[in-house]
């Protein structure tokens, strides 16, 4: 191991001087004698390297001895990480003892080559009606979950983890990037109570941690997911929140001496996002499907950060405060959410027609709402009255009780297969259920439960 010494400290950025013949490579991990890990970002010449600190730089001083590990940051991978909470370095932070991993992988890896990649037209059934119908997920696809505070991003994520774990016996990796510590704690206990903790690896870099941790924690989680994929599994990789990954990069960029670009973001924004997103892909052995929560600063979708994220996504699930205020959960906006998979060649003609039919009726209802508000229902034509009645049933039928929310709702969760989802909505569009009151469609699973509920009304 070659050794150097600290020559300059500026916040989270540390300069270290090494002998000329033993300069560390970019991305090598260095260990300070105080136990802090640094990651090399630039070589400045004269044996000096500029690093970011993966931990607080409090108490460091010039002249401290630094050793080169000659490797990038190595984190534990494999099934031993399931059910554990780790930090950016893969160290356990759940007070449950050592991880006991059999293997460690470097967090900086190249994306799979073209030959290894497989095209993903196979759908991943989530059991959530509105998602499977309107914005279906592809196996190995990337999904953006857009929403403000309190509309249900985290609950949707937890339900997806639960459904994949129980129904598909798949593994999930959750990377909390710049998370609130309280949310991370809630998430852990929810997973524990839902009995799916043994199928999830949790990696946290909270809001109060230095920017180096928040910048790298997404790569730590991704490395764990890649290991599961290479073992031939279909993995779900959750990132909450991808915006804070960008923000951490912005924080260290100026300290590293780079000129800021538009809106003060780092000039390497597109490259940093690309490096992360290109590794999230399916190979011939397995798939990584990612669900990323996206915070939109000041609701401006043209902001460089969400705009860069958009370029990588296959599906966008937009959660709407207006729908949540009606008590319809999951509060997914069926007119705003999109998916590249919603194509007759991928999902089949029937699914496509039903999804477009549902959107058409809801759009027409949206237009009629103004007339109803002023003149009332009686002034509508018979045809429009029928549209409104069916639209209200569809709106309610898009709601669904979640397994992870049983504690709050008091109703047992439901998993609905894609076949049942299409059958139910097709029936409503065709007028088969025009005689059933709309209350029967609220918070149920399949259409058979609607008929059962209607009998008891």
UniProtKB/Swiss-Prot annotation:
Q: Where in the cell is it found?
A: Cell inner membrane
User: Domain of life of the organism in this record?
Assistant: Bacteria
Family annotation (Gene3D superfamilies) = 2.40.10.170, Bovine Mitochondrial F1-atpase, Atp Synthase Beta Chain, Chain D, domain 3, P-loop containing nucleotide triphosphate hydrolases
Q: Does the keyword Kinase apply?
A: no
Query: What is the protein's membrane topology class?
Result: Peripheral membrane protein
MF GO annotations: ATP binding; ATP hydrolysis activity; proton-transporting ATP synthase activity, rotational mechanism
Q: Which GO terms describe its cellular component?
A: plasma membrane; proton-transporting ATP synthase complex
Keywords, alphabetical? ATP synthesis, ATP-binding, Cell inner membrane, Cell membrane, CF(1), Hydrogen ion transport, Ion transport, Membrane, Nucleotide-binding, Translocase, Transport
- Answer yes or no on keyword Cell inner membrane: yes
One family from Pfam that matches here is: ATP-synt_ab
Q: Which reaction does it catalyse?
A: ATP + H2O + 4 H(+)(in) = ADP + phosphate + 5 H(+)(out)
Q: How does it assemble?
A: F-type ATPases have 2 components, CF(1) - the catalytic core - and CF(0) - the membrane proton channel. CF(1) has five subunits: alpha(3), beta(3), gamma(1), delta(1), epsilon(1). CF(0) has three main subunits: a(1), b(2) and c(9-12). The alpha and beta chains form an alternating ring which encloses part of the gamma chain. CF(1) is attached to CF(0) by a central stalk formed by the gamma and epsilon chains, while a peripheral stalk is formed by the delta and b chains.
Q: What does this protein do?
A: Produces ATP from ADP in the presence of a proton gradient across the membrane. The catalytic sites are hosted primarily by the beta subunits.
HAMAP family, from UniProt? ATP_synth_beta_bact (MF_01347)
| Family membership | Belongs to the ATPase alpha/beta chains family.
Name the chain's protein: ATP synthase subunit beta
Q: Which organism is it from?
A: Haemophilus influenzae (strain ATCC 51907 / DSM 11121 / KW20 / Rd)
Chain's gene name? atpD
């Amino acid at each position: 191991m070659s050794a150097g010494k600290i020559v300059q400290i500026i916040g989270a950025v540390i300069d270290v001087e090494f002998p000329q013949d033993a300069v560390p490579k970019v991305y090598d991990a260095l260990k300070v004698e105080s136990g802090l890990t640094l990651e090399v970002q630039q070589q400045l010449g004269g044996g000096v390297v500029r690093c970011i600190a993966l931990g607080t730089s409090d108490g460091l001083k010039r002249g401290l001895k630094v050793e080169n590990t000659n490797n990038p940051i190595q984190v534990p991978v494999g099934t031993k990480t399931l059910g554990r909470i780790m930090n950016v370095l893969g160290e356990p932070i759940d007070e449950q003892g050592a991880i006991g991993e059999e293997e460690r992988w470097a967090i900086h890896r190249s994306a799979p080559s073209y030959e290894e990649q497989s095209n993903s037209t196979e759908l991943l059934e989530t059991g959530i009606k509105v998602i499977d119908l309107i914005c279906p997920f592809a196996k190995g696809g990337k999904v953006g979950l857009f929403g403000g505070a309190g509309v249900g991003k985290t609950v949707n994520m937890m339900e997806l983890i639960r459904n994949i774990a129980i129904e598909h016996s798949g593994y999930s990796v959750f990377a909390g990037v710049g998370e609130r510590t309280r949310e991370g704690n809630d998430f852990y206990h929810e997973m524990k109570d839902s009995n799916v903790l043994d199928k999830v690896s949790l990696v946290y870099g909270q809001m109060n941690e230095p920017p180096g941790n928040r910048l790298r924690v997404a790569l730590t989680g991704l490395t764990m997911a890649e290991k599961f994929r290479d073992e031939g599994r279909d993995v779900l990789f959750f990132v909450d929140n991808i915006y804070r990954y960008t923000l951490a990069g912005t924080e260290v960029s100026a300290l590293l001496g780079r000129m800021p670009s538009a809106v003060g973001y780092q000039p390497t924004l597109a490259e940093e996002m690309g490096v992360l997103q290109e590794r999230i892909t399916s190979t011939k052995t397995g798939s990584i499907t990612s669900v990323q929560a996206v915070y939109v600063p000041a609701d401006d979708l043209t902001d460089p950060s969400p705009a860069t994220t958009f370029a990588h996504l296959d599906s966008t699930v937009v959660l709407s405060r207006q729908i949540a205020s009606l008590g319809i959960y999951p509060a997914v906006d069926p007119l705003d959410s999109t998916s590249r998979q919603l194509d007759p060649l991928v999902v089949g003609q029937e699914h496509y027609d039903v999804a477009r039919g549902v959107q058409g009726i809801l759009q027409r209802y949206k237009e009629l709402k103004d007339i109803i508000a002023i003149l009332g229902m009686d002034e509508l034509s018979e045809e429009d009255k029928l549209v409104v009645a069916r639209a209200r049933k569809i709106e309610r039928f898009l709601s669904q009780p979640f397994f992870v929310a049983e504690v709050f709702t008091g109703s047992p969760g439901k998993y609905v297969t894609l076949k049942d989802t299409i059958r139910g909505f097709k029936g409503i569009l065709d007028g088969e259920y025009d005689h059933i009151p709309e209350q029967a469609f609220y918070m149920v699973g399949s259409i058979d439960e609607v008929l059962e509920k209607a009998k008891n009304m």
